[in-house]
Each structure stands twice: as C-alpha cells, then as structure tokens.
C-alpha cells in the first residue's frame, strides 16, 4: 500500500513539474515584449481608465496586479531601431544588454494604485514623452525587456 501511494505522489510531482518547469527558466521573448509594451498607431490616450483597460485586455493582470507597466505608442520599427544604439548597463539590473533611445518616444506609464487589490487592479495613467531603455537579444537584436524611461 505504501509503495502504491509513493507511486501516485511521484506521478503527481512529475505532472506538476511538467506544467511549471517551462516557465521557470523561460527567457523573455519579443512576443512577450510586444504584448506587454507595444501599442503602435495609438496616440497616448488621456482617459484615466486606459491603463485598466489595456492591462486587462493584454492579459497582464491575469494572475496578479503588475505594479508598473509602460506602453509604447511608436512603430515596431522605431522601437526595434533602439537595439542598434550603443549598448549599456540596464538601469534596473546589472545586465549589459540595454540600449537607450536617441530621441524621446510617446509612452503611457501605468502605476498600480496603493489601495488596489487583485482581481480589481486599478491603475493611474500618465502620458509622457521620454527616452526609453530596453534590453535586446538575438541575432538580429530584438527588444525583449522594457527597462526604464529617462
């Protein structure tokens, strides 16, 4: 009987690890970057609820309230071109694969309000024109992580 229980527990463990493992070591991808940050062709919207709508529509608040997110209102080509700028150390980590835009871009910063609790994620919306810093990987280099605005 003990051996049977051990086998069942082992089988469940293998099944759970099969579900969890792919996301553990998963590297950021250009698809994730696009889903979380790109909003080309859309001018910055001054509606105070636009962040709430975009975060939900893009599935960014599917499992929890993300504290901060930034949407880029520029063409994919313009953002991709940032990867050809001089390489630098990222602002939010010690990674050295970041690049800073040479000009300002239209962005929308979404910041979680302090009183907000999942699943009712509530964000403040701030439209800006700032330089951005992104991490790029691959050959050719493509954006995979939004690092900061400066």
Swiss-Prot record:
Predominant subcellular localization, coarse grouping: secreted
Catalytic activity: an [RNA] containing cytidine + H2O = an [RNA]-3'-cytidine-3'-phosphate + a 5'-hydroxy-ribonucleotide-3'-[RNA]; an [RNA] containing uridine + H2O = an [RNA]-3'-uridine-3'-phosphate + a 5'-hydroxy-ribonucleotide-3'-[RNA]
Residue numbers binding substrate: 35, 66-70, 91
Cystine bridges: 51-110, 65-121, 83-136, 90-98
Subcellular location: Secreted
Residues making up the signal peptide according to the UniProt record: 1-25
PROSITE patterns to which the protein is assigned, alphabetical: RNASE_PANCREATIC
GO CC term, one of those recorded: extracellular region
Keywords, comma-separated and alphabetical: Disulfide bond, Endonuclease, Hydrolase, Lyase, Nuclease, Secreted, Signal
CDD domains: RNase_A_canonical
Single annotated GO MF: nucleic acid binding
Record-level GO BP terms: defense response to Gram-positive bacterium
Record-linked Pfam families: RnaseA (PF00074)
Enzyme nomenclature, EC number: 4.6.1.18
Domain of life, per lineage: Eukaryota
Catalytic machinery residues: 37, 145
Family statement drawn from the similarity comment of this UniProt entry: Belongs to the pancreatic ribonuclease family.
Assembly information from the UniProt record: Monomer.
Function text: Endonuclease that catalyzes the cleavage of RNA on the 3' side of pyrimidine nucleotides. Acts on single-stranded and double-stranded RNA.
Designated name of the protein: Ribonuclease pancreatic delta-type
